[in-house]
């Protein structure tokens, strides 16, 4: 009888405690997200290389990019008008929402030879010093693993040409050392990481 009571107590504690260990539900999409999904896809998983995947991106990176678009430190003919008049709270809500979404694989199949060259270039230029191992990103440094290939190429070329300079000089410095082939190699490598 004593064993049964002990078992019953432990079982009831586990049942009562289980909601405390349950995962919190994903945050509801803020109203402004309805506009974002037209380009960035459902839950921030872009299905075209023209637009970056926002799902799983770092909160701080998303928030700072929205601020930079609004302050004209970064420019894009489609994105810049979207942030005009956006409030700080709306930016925070969007960054919070998209950072908590799960990124999905793009289906990109890297060219093995280019990806191998890209890995060597990424190692030589110390990409993981900022983007971390697995290119997961941190704080204001973006997650680039599994990002859209075309988008990676476009951004590396923009950093190289210094048409995108909202990076504090880090990426413009690194990209300036890359040839166009190097950029394609690195993009093959990074876009293929899942």
Residue ranges and their predicted role:
Residues 1-11:
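Bacterial N-terminal signal peptides that target proteins for export
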Residues 17-20:
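N-terminal signal peptide c-region/cleavage motif recognized by signal peptidases
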Residues 23-45, 106, 110-133, 148:
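Sequence/structural segment immediately N-terminal to covalent heme-attachment motifs in c-type
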Residues 32-41, 60, 64-67, 92-96, ...:
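C-type cytochrome heme c attachment motif
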Residues 44-76, 80-86, 119, 123, ...:
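Gly/Gly-Pro-rich "capping" loops immediately C-terminal to redox-active cysteine motifs
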Residues 45-46, 75, 100-113, 128, ...:
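Inter-heme linker and motif-flanking segments adjacent to c-type heme-binding CXXCH motifs
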Residues 84-106, 150, 176-194:
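C-terminal capping alpha-helices of c-type cytochrome domains
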């Amino acid at each position: 009888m004593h064993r049964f009571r002990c078992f019953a107590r432990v079982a009831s504690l586990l049942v009562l405690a289980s909601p405390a260990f349950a995962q919190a539900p994903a945050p509801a999409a803020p109203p402004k997200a309805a506009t974002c999904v037209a380009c960035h896809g459902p839950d921030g998983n872009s299905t075209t290389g023209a637009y970056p995947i926002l799902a799983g991106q770092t909160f701080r990176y998303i928030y700072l990019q929205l601020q930079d678009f609004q302050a004209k430190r970064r420019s894009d003919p489609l994105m810049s008008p979207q942030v005009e008049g956006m409030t700080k709270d709306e930016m925070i809500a969007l960054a919070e929402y998209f950072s908590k979404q799960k990124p999905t694989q793009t289906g990109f199949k890297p060219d093995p030879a280019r990806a191998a060259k890209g890995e060597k270039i990424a190692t030589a230029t110390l990409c993981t010093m900022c983007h971390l191992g697995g290119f997961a990103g941190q704080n204001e440094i973006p997650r680039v693993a599994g990002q859209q290939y075309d988008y990676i190429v476009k951004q590396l070329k923009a950093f190289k040409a210094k048409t995108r300079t909202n990076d504090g000089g880090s990426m413009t410095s690194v990209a300036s050392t890359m040839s166009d082939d190097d950029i394609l190699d690195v993009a093959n490598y990074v876009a293929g990481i899942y």
